[in-house]
Amino acid sequence: MSAMLQCMSHTPLKGYFDPAADVVEEVAALAAAVREEVAHFDPEVVYLFAPDHYNGFFLDLMPQFCLGIEATSVGDYQTPKGPLRVPRALAEACAGAVIARGIDLAFSYRMQVDHGFAQTLVEVLGGLARYPVVPIMINAVAPPLASFQRARLLGAAVGEFARGQGGRALFIASGGMSHNPPIPQIATATDPEVIERIVAGRNPTPEARAARQQRTVAAAQAFAAGDSPLRPLNPDWDRALMKRLCSRDWAAIDAYRNDEVSAAAGASAHELKSWVAATAAMESATAGQWDARERYYRAIPEWLAGFGAMSGLGRHP
């Protein structure tokens, strides 16, 4: 089989509150280059690991990992709304194989995904339904959270399944890097409306979604101005993790502890478990016969995130 890895940050703030024009152009050029590589590779199936932000998954039932057998984008921020092109039989087989490997993977025949999936599908693939995609959600916002090691084992199980299928497989990770956006937590929330939104906030009105999005924009504006209680970005931490992923230093990655990650890089740095899972999938699918490269990093306060990208290409006889 042939395999490709593409890991890239996402940001809901793109187009709402942007950094300087040259930075916007730099990131757009990165996305265009990745799309061109993907088009040339022409994957037969895509395995996309990404988080949710209380838009598709809620505290009434929050899995650590969930594979979508049918999935639809909710269309938050400026992402398109509509169905993903999920190959049902393949997704069902993947879920079964991963569970057989000892990973307690949830699955959904009516999965809703947000910008964490949709923005990456558009920017990396060129659209929600351009290629067959198996979407896999990794909980990164609602403690208690699975460990980095469990994310690796999830990815390894997916990669082993993909290797057995053969063909051209693309593994994508969306999320990160260091960031600490104003996502409410059940442990500290006091407003009944906020609590209800994170427990069972499916299908909000357009007005409610717009108000939530405006609060995120306001938080980004304050953060960029240096007038925010949000945790600072941590470029050194981000670069160290990328380096460990590129070298496949699994012992170091397995040693990451959730509380230490939150303290060093912010509560939403756990989105990088998507990168860990996708990289582990690539490693397993190719039996280690692949090359990785760090291709981009910039701390972008306007987007409330360290923005990074890494890629890989390999094959297994």
UniProtKB/Swiss-Prot annotation:
Q: Does the keyword Iron apply?
A: yes
- Supply the CDD domains for this chain: MhpB_like
Q: Which GO terms describe its biological process?
A: 3-phenylpropionate catabolic process
The catalytic site is made up of 115, 179
Keyword terms of this UniProt record: Aromatic hydrocarbons catabolism, Dioxygenase, Iron, Oxidoreductase
Assigned EC number: 1.13.11.16
Q: What class of enzyme is it?
A: oxidoreductase
- What cofactors does this protein use? Fe(2+)
Q: In which pathway does it act?
A: Aromatic compound metabolism; 3-phenylpropanoate degradation
Which Pfam families has this protein been placed in? Answer: LigB
Q: Keyword Iron, does the record have it? A: yes
Q: Name one GO molecular function term.
A: 3-carboxyethylcatechol 2,3-dioxygenase activity
Q: Which reaction does it catalyse?
A: 3-(2,3-dihydroxyphenyl)propanoate + O2 = (2Z,4E)-2-hydroxy-6-oxonona-2,4-dienedioate + H(+); (2E)-3-(2,3-dihydroxyphenyl)prop-2-enoate + O2 = (2Z,4E,7E)-2-hydroxy-6-oxonona-2,4,7-trienedioate + H(+)
Family designation:
Belongs to the LigB/MhpB extradiol dioxygenase family.
**Subunit-level organization:** Homotetramer.
The free-text function statement in the UniProt record for this protein reads:
Catalyzes the non-heme iron(II)-dependent oxidative cleavage of 2,3-dihydroxyphenylpropionic acid and 2,3-dihydroxicinnamic acid into 2-hydroxy-6-ketononadienedioate and 2-hydroxy-6-ketononatrienedioate, respectively.
The name this protein goes by in its record: 2,3-dihydroxyphenylpropionate/2,3-dihydroxicinnamic acid 1,2-dioxygenase
Species, as recorded: Azoarcus sp. (strain BH72)
